[in-house]
Regions:
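Juxtamembrane "anchor/assembly" segments of surface/extracellular structural proteins
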Residues: 1-49, 75-91
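Short beta-strand and beta-hairpin "edge-sheet" elements
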Residues: 54-89
């Protein structure tokens, strides 16, 4: 699924404020979901490896995961166990 300008996409890294992006692609399958092809100002956006990444459309969260490299985010269900989450977060 491609999230483009028409859906007001914003990216949030860890606890920072979300910022607008041009587009991103979410791929979902039975085993995992990934966020890729993040475009900012017409160029591929490089993610900080290990960062928690949240994709918003308007006021809705579409995807939450961890950056496994500079251009791929894997969903939290595939990267974390309840023991590894902080505070009151639960999968």
């Amino acid at each position: 699924m491609i999230i483009d300008q028409g859906r007001d996409p914003r990216l949030q890294l860890d606890d920072a404020e979300p910022f607008r992006i041009d587009s991103a692609e979410v791929t979902r399958d039975i085993e995992r979901s990934t966020l890729t092809n993040i475009i900012l100002d017409g160029d591929a956006f490089s993610l900080p490896v290990g960062a928690r990444v949240t994709l918003w459309t308007g006021s809705n969260v579409v995807f939450v995961g961890k950056a496994v490299d500079e251009h791929h985010v894997l969903d939290l269900l595939s990267t974390e166990t309840d023991d590894e989450l902080t505070g009151d977060e639960v999968i």
